[in-house]
Amino acid sequence: MFKAVLFDLDGVITDTAEYHFRAWKALAEEIGINGVDRQFNEQLKGVSREDSLQKILDLADKKVSAEEFKELAKRKNDNYVKMIQDVSPADVYPGILQLLKDLRSNKIKIALASASKNGPFLLEKMNLTGYFDAIADPAEVAASKPAPDIFIAAAHAVGVAPSESIGLEDSQAGIQAIKDSGALPIGVGRPEDLGDDIVIVPDTSYYTLEFLKEVWLQKQK
């Protein structure tokens, strides 16, 4: 039986992914870069702020100084933070609150493994902080997703090996990170975006404790 569930935040617990997309698109247009559409945005999901900005700059072969890079990253985040001020418990995705309750009542550890530095703020806005045993700090890991560092850190933060954990993700980068950490990925989204070699559910209402147990047992066979 698995001992921990490691949650991504954007696109798994709530739809802050949409706010990230709008904030990146606005920033790109401000600096004269076109092409940050929904298709390109798939590359940014689950990726750190700095790595996302670099991908956008690379799109137009644009070079900026270290100081300007820092300012652009801050500008995007300031815009994003304004957008998420109104996030509330009503924004929690279907099934997630019940899953958190069931995991706690079954003494299964819960950790956040998000690239978002705003993770603690968002959990607080949605009244979910108390369900989490640990929040891995993205600023403390050496490499962002698709590197496995954040999932390894999240598992270790609750005293569990990644191989004894399930990771929940909605992005290609995140799924790769879970695989490389040694945890078992269960994706939410479309197989054409996430790959056909893992279990994928169409929406978060499928994330029940019973379903997670089922997938875990199948993978152990």
Curated annotation (Swiss-Prot):
Binds 1 magnesium ion per subunit. The modification 4-aspartylphosphate is found at D8. The record marks S114, K145 as: Important for catalytic activity and assists the phosphoryl transfer reaction to Asp8 by balancing charge and orienting the reacting groups. Induction: By maltose, trehalose and sucrose and repressed by glucose and lactose. Changing K76A: 100-fold reduction in the conversion of beta-G1P to G6P in the presence of beta-G1,6bisP. Changing H20A: Impairs Asp-8 phosphorylation by beta-G1,6bisP and phosphoryl transfer from the phospho-Asp8 to the substrate beta-G1P. It catalyses: beta-D-glucose 1-phosphate = beta-D-glucose 6-phosphate. Its EC number is 5.4.2.6. Keywords: Carbohydrate metabolism, Cytoplasm, Isomerase, Magnesium, Metal-binding, Phosphoprotein. Beta-D-glucose 6-phosphate binds at D10, G46, V47, R49, S116, K117, N118. NCBIfam families: bPGM, HAD-SF-IA-v3, PGMB-YQAB-SF. Catalyzes the interconversion of D-glucose 1-phosphate (G1P) and D-glucose 6-phosphate (G6P), forming beta-D-glucose 1,6-(bis)phosphate (beta-G16P) as an intermediate. The beta-phosphoglucomutase (Beta-PGM) acts on the beta-C(1) anomer of G1P. Glucose or lactose are used in preference to maltose, which is only utilized after glucose or lactose has been exhausted. It plays a key role in the regulation of the flow of carbohydrate intermediates in glycolysis and the formation of the sugar nucleotide UDP-glucose. The catalysis proceeds via a phosphoenzyme formed by reaction of an active-site nucleophile with the cofactor glucose 1,6-diphosphate (G1,6-diP). The phosphorylated mutase binds either G1P or G6P and transfers the phosphoryl group to the C(6)OH or C(1)OH, respectively. This is Beta-phosphoglucomutase. It comes from Lactococcus lactis subsp. lactis (strain IL1403). The gene is pgmB.
